[in-house]
Amino acid sequence: MKIKSSLKSLKKRDLNSKLVRRRGRVYIINKTNPKFKARQK
């Protein structure tokens, strides 16, 4: 999982990426290609 201060560019990397908020943190999840997971710092 990548940890970045800005997730906008990471969201554009794949069409299936979704932005999710969990416990006050922002995540990018991707069911079809899990290598695109990311969390905002």
UniProtKB/Swiss-Prot annotation:
<dbReference type="GO" id="GO:0006412">
    <property type="term" value="P:translation"/>
</dbReference>
<dbReference type="GO" id="GO:1990904">
    <property type="term" value="C:ribonucleoprotein complex"/>
</dbReference>
<dbReference type="InterPro" id="IPR000473">
    <property type="entry name" value="Ribosomal_bL36"/>
</dbReference>
<dbReference type="InterPro" id="IPR035977">
    <property type="entry name" value="Ribosomal_bL36_sp"/>
</dbReference>
<keyword id="KW-0687">Ribonucleoprotein</keyword>
<keyword id="KW-0689">Ribosomal protein</keyword>
<dbReference type="Pfam" id="PF00444">
    <property type="entry name" value="Ribosomal_L36"/>
</dbReference>
<protein>
    <recommendedName>
        <fullName>Large ribosomal subunit protein bL36</fullName>
    </recommendedName>
</protein>
<dbReference type="GO" id="GO:0005840">
    <property type="term" value="C:ribosome"/>
</dbReference>
<dbReference type="InterPro" id="IPR047621">
    <property type="entry name" value="Ribosomal_L36_bact"/>
</dbReference>
<dbReference type="GO" id="GO:0003735">
    <property type="term" value="F:structural constituent of ribosome"/>
</dbReference>
<comment type="similarity">
    <text>Belongs to the bacterial ribosomal protein bL36 family.</text>
</comment>
